[in-house]
Amino acid sequence: PYSSVDENGNYVGIDIELATEAFNRMGYQAEFQMIPWEEKARLLAEGSLDCLWSCFTMNGRENDYEWAGPYLYSRQVVAVRSDSQIYALKDLEGKRAAVQATTRASGVLLHEIASPVPQLKQVNCFSTTEELFAALRKGYVDAIAGHEAMITAFVKGGNGNYRLLEESLYVSELGVAFEKGTHRELAERLTETLKAMEADGTITRIVEKYGLDAAKVV
């Protein structure tokens, strides 16, 4: 629910609406591009993009970018098939999982950062959420992991075939990333604009429109 393209080719989602409103308040018109997420650093460095705004976690990357935010908080969670014998993170030991490449969930499952999960048999990294969901639907993996809103939407649309684990993988702060050493003033202005949007209820209204609990994420 953060950013996607609908059947009419329009960009939709929480981040799309937040970015549009924030930049409008600052006197800019937001333009959006969908990119292969693993190429984000290159595209930002070469100037093909001005910023990254797509459910992007600040934790552990504080010194890698010029940041605006945090503007939302997100849990990283795990989903499994309803008939799975996986009920807790410890049950993932020796199992196969799928994540989106270069995300916080991938870092946790690959033990690149502090991780509450045991060693898995296999971690598959995909470019898109569609590939991620298909891997679980087709039984290629035992579990998938990612941002709570994204995984919850998948589970809710799964006709009872999937469920969430109660435990969180990780709690992350979401921010807007600009290339390090550039746009510092713009990032600071954006942070102040986002704070104003939180104070006047705009962020709450937008996230609740997409089914999120504002008390947990704002």
Question: Can you name each region flagged by the protein language model?
Answer:
Residues 1-55, 63, 125, 189, ...:
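Extracytoplasmic small-molecule ligand-binding "clamshell" domains
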Residues 2-3, 12, 90-106:
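Short loop->beta-strand "edge-of-pocket" segments that line small-molecule binding or catalytic clefts
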Residues 4-7, 19-29, 105-126, 155-159, ...:
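Ligand-binding cleft/hinge of the Venus flytrap
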Residues 22, 44-45, 92, 136-137, ...:
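Hydrophobic residues within well-ordered alpha-helices
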Residues 33-38, 47-59, 82, 100-104, ...:
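Beta->alpha turn/N-cap motifs
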Residues 39-42, 54-64, 108-111, 135-170:
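A ligand-binding cleft/hinge motif common to bilobed small-molecule-binding domains
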Residues 69, 80-97, 187-188:
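Flexible hinge/capping segments at coil-to-helix
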Residues 73-80, 156-195, 213-218:
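Periplasmic-binding protein-like
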